[in-house]
Amino acid sequence: MGGDDLSFTRLVITALFGLLMLLQIKETSASTSFVSSSVCKSDHLTYTKPYQQGSLFTINGNPVEKLRFCEALRFHKANGCIFEDSFSDDFCTIHSLLGRRFLEEKTVKDSKNSKPKTEYSHVKVSIAGSGFLLLCCALCCPCFHKERKANSHEVLPKESNSVHQVSSFEMSPSSEKIPQSPFRAPPSPSRVPQSPSRYAMSPRPSRLGPLNLTMSQINTATGNFADSHQIGEGGFGVVFKGVLDDGQVVAIKRAKKEHFENLRTEFKSEVDLLSKIGHRNLVKLLGYVDKGDERLIITEYVRNGTLRDHLDGARGTKLNFNQRLEIVIDVCHGLTYLHSYAERQIIHRDIKSSNILLTDSMRAKVADFGFARGGPTDSNQTHILTQVKGTVGYLDPEYMKTYHLTAKSDVYSFGILLVEILTGRRPVEAKRLPDERITVRWAFDKYNEGRVFELVDPNARERVDEKILRKMFSLAFQCAAPTKKERPDMEAVGKQLWAIRSSYLRRSME
């Protein structure tokens, strides 16, 4: 087909679509309707009357489907709300229930005090107009899409002595917006949390893209690795905060010179594994240096400190129970991705509170992959035979005895971490009484004695239902079982945590 024929076809399709949209607008404008609304607890419910095909339903100003709207009505009626006779619910076939509160009808007004009966028509006119414009752009401007696609794969040319950057495919920027947790707003049926299969189990690339820096730029960003820029230290090296010329803040991990040769394997492992993963609950690799006597790993900067800092109150605030539950679920999602959804199974081997970083919005990110190993590649292989590495208190006892590394070793560490988050105590506290020095044993004894409230960190600032606490500790003890056969996998742990979260939400609404 020639270019003129193709243009003519697009023009005809556009004209026909526009005509259909105008007819729909005319039909909508000719109908008469008005808005009925009610407020119950935290939800503002509105719909256009009389009910007909295409009526608009909203909860808190957000358009929703009729099914969700009816679920919200059913929820509020079951919890004692009474709606006036003018607020009809015949379309939901809900039977009226006695309740405790009377709801006043509120008129929905826009910023210009327009009449309610015109609001629905205006909404549909706006939607129709937007759809018409979008179709015109899609049909008439294919060159725009091609140009954007071409530009999205550009890679900056490398300079001499520059930082290696990961591939643009693996580290492509994204404008992803992380959904708010249901604990950060009053819960309602219009904000039902997503299922574990859809929530953070798949890769979620960071907004940050790959970097291409020279050593001169890195020295400038860190003040020549000044002590004032130091933000942490681990087995691999010292971590510095770096501020780039464009204002972007990064974390730069510098290998210790005294262990330079011995840590070559850890460096290569961390770079290789980080370059192949992308998940919102894992720290993102931006680049690395392996030249001369310098080995550097550059990652995104997570400025709200470590989980251990917050448990200690070192950041000025203490974590409440809601935040602790959020963090546990985030860490679980990150590990589930590593074990089950990454290109190849990855075993972290060093899950601990100081390797969990928190964002300003208290999202948790798993960091420090220096000890990480790829899991078995053969379906017949059950484990990796390797030297024991990790942190005392979090180490899987079966792994220490047999040198057999599996993903269940991370599960054990997660169980210890869960006890730490709930109690606020470190895994090993040598200054305590003999029967309290090993935190997981002390917690297990208290749990069996039915004294679960004595286990909770007093800084949690909330008295949680005993059943919720028992479920949390029971899950922690399952994960920290002595042998891997007794431990669940991280995906099963995630499902249990989601069930606990649902129970917690229901009780918080009672």
From Swiss-Prot:
Q: Which residues carry this modification: Phosphotyrosine?
A: 399
- E.C. designation(s): 2.7.11.1
Q: Note the Gene3D superfamilies from the entry.
A: Phosphorylase Kinase, domain 1, Transferase(Phosphotransferase) domain 1
Where is the secretion signal located? 1-30
Positions modified as Phosphoserine? 354
Protein name (Swiss-Prot/TrEMBL): Calmodulin-binding receptor-like cytoplasmic kinase 3
Q: Where in the cell is it found?
A: Cytoplasm
What are the start and end residues of every segment in region (CaM-binding)?
Answer: 240-265
Which residues fall in a compositionally biased region of kind Polar residues? 166-178
Residues with PTM Phosphothreonine = 214, 386, 391
Q: Which residues form the Protein kinase domain?
A: 225-499
Entry-linked SUPFAM superfamilies: Protein kinase-like (PK-like)
Q: Which UniProt keywords apply?
A: ATP-binding, Cytoplasm, Kinase, Nucleotide-binding, Phosphoprotein, Serine/threonine-protein kinase, Signal, Transferase
Active-site feature positions? 350 (proton acceptor)
Q: Name one Pfam family in it.
A: PK_Tyr_Ser-Thr
| Assembly, per entry | Interacts with calmodulin (CaM) in a Ca(2+)-dependent manner.
What is the similarity comment for this entry? Belongs to the protein kinase superfamily. Ser/Thr protein kinase family.
